[in-house]
Swiss-Prot record:
Pathway: Cofactor degradation; L-ascorbate degradation; D-xylulose 5-phosphate from L-ascorbate: step 1/4. Induction: Induced by L-ascorbate. Repressed by UlaR. This is Probable L-ascorbate-6-phosphate lactonase UlaG. Disulfide bonds: none annotated.
Amino acid sequence: MSKVQSITRESWILSTFPEWGSWLNEEIEQEQVAPGTFAMWWLGCTGIWLKSEGGTNVCVDFWCGTGKQSHGNPLMKTGHQMQRMAGVKKLQPNLRTTPFVLDPFAIRQIDAVLATHDHNDHIDVNVAAAVMQNCADDVPFIGPQTCVDLWVGWGVPKERCIVVKPGDVVKVKDIEIHALDAFDRTALITLPADQKAAGVLPDGMDVRAVNYLFKTPGGNLYHSGDSHYSNYYAKHGNEHQIDVALGSYGENPRGITDKMTSADILRMAESLNTKVVIPFHHDIWSNFQADPQEIRVLWEMKKDRLKYGFKPFIWQVGGKFTWPLDKDNFEYHYPRGFDDCFTIEPDLPFKSFL
């Protein structure tokens, strides 16, 4: 059989997916976090891998799914939160635009799996399966009640799950995880299709979503999940020291308010008294595509007049950020390589060839 005859759609998928293979898994495992620092990697959407100076590994909102894949059904699912929000009927054209940079089934060293809320792009059955199958049998799954309900429904033992609500603190080795109030109003209208939201007081946010503050020996990280802007960010900033804050940013389509704008991101950072603010979530959905440079432009316009005490950082999916080593950087660039040029003699026809 010739090579072209032996190749199938399945063999093509297995040879190219996930796009980064185990490259990032290996990078994270090999990373030695220096004392007085923490390292984190952006996994896409609001997915974050955090590693402390003590070698503690936790992942938050790691999602391995995708968006729309077919024009087959031109209508939105009845009762979808976006339909409730804007009274729309047409299918939402939200295609995933970000590659898969971490292989969940190549994960071996992990100390906790966390989710901020139960929306499909923030909690993942494949991650749960991979951790259950390949990692230590005491790795906890931490999240609000709706997330724990999902995990247990997928087959994660109830005793492996920890339900958190605002005010709760969970210690995972040298990382202290504080569950804080979430401000994700979209979560409150994510309801069963037959349940009406109009004229009904929403149930509590606390069972549906939380924000997290990760206190590590090398600094503190604030993860806001899918939260919108809220005045209560200032309360969190008053009560906690925050070094780096992550905020869900995007260009909201007409009739929709689901992501923070550039102005919201700056207000969040100012309210939290953070040193660095990093937008995320803008990478993942084609119909919420936004340019994070807008945040920096607006910051440049306002920083001197408003005496901002923080800087924005523009990240790339799969990239690493180390606090405090990267605190004065404005943008991430993937490693460019070739730092060992002329280690050996070039093999060129003559010196001036290039």
